[in-house]
Each structure stands twice: as structure tokens, then as C-alpha cells.
A protein has these predicted regions:
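Short, well-ordered coil/turn segments that N-cap beta-strands
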Residues: 1-3, 47-49, 78-83, 110-116, ...
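An alpha-helical appendage that flanks or caps ligand/catalytic pockets
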Residues: 5-9, 136-172, 214-335, 373-383
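Glycine-rich, proline-tolerant flexible connector loops at the mouths of alpha/beta enzymes
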Residues: 49-70, 89-91, 123, 209-211, ...
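Conserved, mostly hydrophobic/aromatic
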Residues: 46, 54, 74, 107, ...
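N-terminal beta1-alpha1-beta2 module of alpha/beta enzyme domains
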Residues: 1-77, 81-83, 181-182, 380-383
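Acidic (Asp/Glu)-rich catalytic clusters
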Residues: 43-44, 72-80, 104, 108-114, ...
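Flexible, glycine-rich active-site loops centered on histidine and acidic residues
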Residues: 2-30, 90-160, 203-217, 264, ...
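Active-site mouth loops of central-metabolism enzymes
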Residues: 17-32, 88-98, 178-188, 250-253, ...
Length: 383
């Protein structure tokens, strides 16, 4: 298993110290400055990939709405760490596929081939704001957009004609550095999406939020089974990516009492409660009745404070502890088939210096032991 990082660029917790808009500006600037410093340090420490999300309108949760700009800056200020789009929102209402081909390839050129390209459809709250269909048409758009992007990369000139989109023959530039193109991933929150990723030859990006490791393992098994049955003619790309990446909150500390004193557990609790609050307010009203019935029982108890932080810890939904304790939990993820653990390290009100120390501990005491265990998947394969 390899250790990655995932950044949503979450501003420090409200209330901010100054009135609007100055408090928001200050909080977001600080978030960016600290995150970039952490990523540059992780590059030196030997972390594998940093993934930057694309989110829109995520009040207090994410200030990362333009991941290509962040990754372009990181391409010029890091030297080893891979740069992950985590993920590009692909339905046509968000962006034209030609723009996706351009921005992903540009970061790949700037970084000399360090891009990992994650793709997804987003959530109803974001889709509605951009005029994206809230039904399965967004899935069709997502798939079609990937075909278009890869076609642009692979051909000197390219044209497209379909019910959803048409454009005349044009040359897309620049082409990506990697040959034939960067590996492609699919964000998957359900078993159905995990199966889709396996069938299409895409890497799987998932999470361990509000579900025990055993439940996550079911998604991975469904992905692996679909992958084993996949036919070359069904692949969306020329790079077969059979890796699994999973994200969760990760923090390593020297001393548990000290960590409690600097607010570690309050930050975990806030992060989960804010997730529940945001989802129930902005996402739930836009879901189908069946989806609401599935989501509401999970989130309302979290919002009401009925789920103690110890529950997440005991179920290994989060990876927090000394370096040795973190390693023990990480090995559980390794054993169920996770190839890359996306460590979500900037959350709540964690002090920047403690995040930096956590990165040090993981690099010194966890990464070498994971390397010694070996890797199921060393690279993607061209087809």
C-alpha cells in the first residue's frame, strides 16, 4: 500500500475573526498557505500522490473549486509527488470536455507526467446549480466526456457528434506528457459505481466515512469481480487502471494527552457533524425518497450528537493514534484490498504544526513498513 494525501482545502471553523467578507478571505488564505506548505513537505517526505478535490458552494467545507490551478502551482513547486485530480466533475453542465482535456494535459506537461486523473459526476446540490441533470443522464454525460477527452489526447484532430454534444474537427493542445495518457479513476460511493469502474478499466476512488471497513471491503470485492470479467473492448481508455484508493481522516501524534489538548477529537467531531449538517441541509431535499430514507438514518444521529467520536475510532472509520497505532489500522485497509490510502489530514481546527508533525511520523514510521509489505499493483498497463 502507498500513502497519498487528499485536500478539500477546508477553512478553519466558523465563527471567523472578522466580519464578512474579510473573515472568509482570511480563513481561506490561511487554509491555502498551510495546505501548500504541507503538500510541499509531503513531497520531500516521500508521500505518493496528493489529490485535490473540485467542489463548488461548499460553505465552510471546501474552498477548492479550481483544482487545476492548485495542481499547476504544485507541478512547479514539487518534484516527486504525483498530482491527482480528485475529481474532475465531468457532466457537460460543469465544463466542456475540451477544456478538461486541456487542463489535465497542461498539468501533466508542467509536472513531467505526474498526473492521476480522477473523474466523477458530483452531487445533486452542485449539479442543480450548474444545470446538470439529476438523473442517470449525468452518468451518460460522464462516460461520454471521458471518451471525448481520451479521443482528443489520442488523435491529432478530433470531432464528435451525439445527442448530448457535438463539435467540429479541431486539434486539442497540449497533449499529455504520459504515453499514452494519464491513468483514469472513477469516484464511487455505491456498489453500482464500483462495478462500473471495474467494468470500464478505471481505478476506484472510494471512502471509509460512516461505514466500517467490512462494508468498504464489499465495494472493493464488487470492483475486483467486475474487473476480472471486464473485456478490452469495454475499456474507456488505453490505460487499464486496477488500483483502489480510499480516503479517510488520518492523524498521527506523539502523545495522546497532548493531542486531546490541542483539540484533535473536537476536530474529528466537528468534521463529521458538519458533514451531516451540510448534507441534510443542501443534499437531502434533492434526493429521491428512497435515497432520503437510506441517508437520513445515518446522518441525523451524527448531527444530534448521538454518535461519539470513539465509534469512528473503534470501527476504524478514521485512522488516528500513535504511528504504530495508525500502522495497525492502515494494515486493515491493506488487507481488504486498498492500494492507496488517501490521508485527509487538514480537518477541523487542527494546528498546522501538528499536521506537519503527523506527516513526519507517518513518513518515518509507517511508509517504510508499508513499502516492506510490497504492492499488489505497481503500475497501470497500456492496452
Amino acid at each position: 500500500m502507498k500513502l497519498d494525501l487528499l485536500y478539500e482545502f477546508q477553512p478553519k471553523i466558523k465563527p471567523w475573526t472578522k466580519p464578512h467578507p474579510y473573515g472568509q478571505r482570511e480563513a481561506e488564505q490561511r487554509t491555502y498557505d498551510e495546505a501548500i506548505a504541507e503538500i510541499q513537505y509531503a513531497d520531500k517526505l516521500g508521500f505518493n500522490t496528493v489529490w485535490c478535490v473540485e467542489h463548488h458552494f461548499r460553505d465552510g467545507r471546501s474552498a477548492s473549486s479550481c483544482s487545476e490551478a492548485i495542481l499547476g502551482g504544485l507541478a512547479l513547486s514539487t518534484s516527486q509527488i504525483k498530482l491527482g485530480f480528485g475529481v474532475t466533475l465531468m457532466p457537460f453542465g460543469f465544463i466542456h470536455p475540451a477544456r478538461v482535456a486541456e487542463k489535465v494535459a497542461t498539468v501533466d506537461v508542467l509536472s513531467h507526467g505526474r498526473v492521476e486523473w480522477g473523474t466523477g459526476r458530483s452531487t445533486p446540490m452542485e449539479q442543480a446549480a450548474f444545470g446538470v441533470p439529476l438523473d442517470d443522464r449525468s452518468r451518460d454525460h460522464w462516460r461520454e466526456a471521458i471518451e471525448i477527452v481520451v479521443g482528443m489526447w489520442e488523435n491529432e484532430t478530433f470531432a464528435w457528434e451525439s445527442e448530448n454534444l457535438s463539435f467540429p474537427e479541431r486539434m486539442q493542445t497540449p497533449k499529455p506528457f504520459q504515453d499514452p495518457h494519464p491513468p483514469v479513476w472513477q469516484a464511487a460511493a455505491t456498489v453500482k459505481s464500483a462495478v462500473s469502474a471495474g467494468e470500464l478499466g478505471l481505478g476506484l476512488l472510494s471512502f471509509a466515512l460512516l461505514q466500517p471497513v467490512e462494508k468498504m471491503a464489499e465495494h472493493i470485492q464488487a470492483y475486483r469481480s467486475a474487473q476480472a470479467m471486464a473485456r478490452p473492448q469495454d475499456m474507456l481508455t488505453r490505460v487499464r487502471n486496477n488500483r483502489v484508493g480510499v480516503y479517510t481522516l488520518v492523524h498521527a501524534y506523539d502523545d495522546g494527552d497532548e493531542a486531546a489538548a490541542y483539540g484533535l477529537w473536537e476536530s474529528v467531531n466537528w468534521w463529521y457533524k458538519h458533514l451531516a449538517e451540510f448534507t441534510l441541509r443542501w443534499e437531502l431535499p434533492m434526493l429521491s425518497e428512497a435515497e432520503q430514507q437510506a441517508v437520513f438514518p445515518l446522518l441525523q444521529p451524527v448531527l444530534d450528537g448521538q454518535v461519539p467520536v470513539s465509534h469512528y475510532q473503534e470501527q476504524d472509520m478514521i485512522i488516528i493514534g500513535t504511528a504504530d497505532e495508525c500502522l495497525e489500522k492502515i494494515i486493515r485497509y491493506d488487507e481488504v484490498g486498498v492500494d492507496q490510502l488517501l490521508c485527509y489530514v487538514q480537518f477541523g481546527d487542527l494546528p498546522h504544526d501538528k499536521v506537519m508533525r503527523s506527516l513526519e511520523l507517518l513518513a518515518q514510521h509507517v511508509i517504510p513498513k508499508l513499502e516492506a509489505r510490497g504492492h499488489r499493483v505497481e503500475a497501470t498497463a497500456s492496452i
